[in-house]
Amino acid sequence: MAMPDLTHDLTGKLLIAMPGMEDPRFAGAVIFLCVHSPGQAMGLIINKPMEEITFTELMEQLDIPKRGSTPQVPVCFGGPVDMRRGFVLHSPDYAPRGEEALRIDHRFAMTGTLDILEDIAAGRGPKRSLLALGYAGWGEGQLEAEIARNDWLTADATPELVFDHKMERKWDAAVQSLGFDPLMLSSEAGHA
């Protein structure tokens, strides 16, 4: 079977797990793709909350003092790779000190330094953000093969879907953004 041409850049798009996803880490997942190139892909799961820790508890563990009322930034299971590392997906209005944020497009940026957590705790962070612990990563051709196998749907990301929807509603909202009802999806895929 010939592999479809999936060489276009999916950076800034969403991956939506199909109902038949067998890997429990990705079942029901919505992943924001931060980087996609022919050699690799990296994304953050944006709809699986970390039950074990809140943003406030994480700030306490990192000895980051809170000034006033610390916003309750959602903390997500970002993926199974390097779960001790955190990434903040945020609106591009934030300019980090020192290192540059990875500007994904005109609506999204990502920062992986402690500075952003300190700034959020101090009330100087981005207007919109979520924190992901860990990430999802793919090697050369791996993501393209998974998409061709119908493991994932792709959709446009919007700040409203990424930052404003409740985590438990993001999968449904992402599917609905494609123009159909999530109940119409089958766990079985076919090829003509």
Curated annotation (Swiss-Prot):
InterPro entries reported in the protein's UniProt record: AlgH-like
GO CC entries: cytosol
One Pfam family in the UniProt entry: DUF179
Recorded family membership: Belongs to the UPF0301 (AlgH) family.
Protein name listed in UniProt: UPF0301 protein Jann_3896
Organism: Jannaschia sp. (strain CCS1)
